[in-house]
Amino acid sequence: MTASEPTREARLAALRSIGHVPVLIVGGGINGMGTFRDLSLQGVDCILAEQGDFCSGASRAPSRMIHGGLKYLETGEFRLVRESAAERNRLLCNAAHYVSPLEMIIPIHSWFGGVVPALRKFLRRPAKITERGALVIKLGLWLYDLYGALNRVMPRHRMIARQDILREIPDLDPSLKIAASYYDAWITSPERLVVELALDGMAANPGNIALNHLRFNRVTGNQVELQDVESGEVFSLT
């Protein structure tokens, strides 16, 4: 916290003087805080309330991978893949101090395995895919590269010959036929990124407030009740 950043006490004092706010965001994870920052940059007045620490729930718990939705290609959700890959690329560009490329290696044990089940699943027919051969994986990664082309900052996928991948990673099963390499991303500190989003939002629109340990209690008519977890103080907004 620098001298120019509002303390929690200062933000609570500002909240006491607010009777009405157009937008109330409940939850201070990556989605809530990203919304707070976006609205602040657009000049929309808003308040964000998080009952615990920022980024203390689902945003902190996962593998910390930032993926572009590769698995959704099999179910034909191309729009979701395009959006996820674009957001991944934006994070790589805008938050490179926290988000880095991560190479993924896929050992492949057949050439044509899974072609028919993959086609049925793509057509939304019942299918169980037990194996994905080189052809299915090659096609999937080609599409993944295509949908992640906007603002690309990572290499495209590549297929790696058996002898080359075993030389590079000798502990792999030597019965593999070929391997594939593609890139997604991972984040080192999602908590720090969420805090940066909060500070960006409050700097862009100084009237906006992001507060942790502020619980959403209830809605009564057109009134919303918030409560400071630490002191028990209650705030009413319309």
Show where each model-derived region lies.
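Extreme N-terminal leader/targeting segments of oxidoreductases
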Residues: 1-23, 38-42
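Short hydrophobic core segments
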Residues: 24-26, 238
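Glycine-rich Rossmann-fold phosphate-binding loop(s) that bind the pyrophosphate
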Residues: 27-29, 51
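N-terminal Rossmann-fold NAD(P) dinucleotide-binding loop
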Residues: 32-33
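Gly/Ala-rich phosphate-binding loop of Rossmann-like dinucleotide-binding domains
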Residues: 36, 40-41, 200-202
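Glycine-rich FAD pyrophosphate-binding loop
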Residues: 40-60
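Dinucleotide-binding Rossmann-like beta1-alpha1 core, especially the glycine-rich loop
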Residues: 64-166
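Helical element adjacent to the flavin cofactor pocket in flavoenzyme catalytic cores
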Residues: 180-238
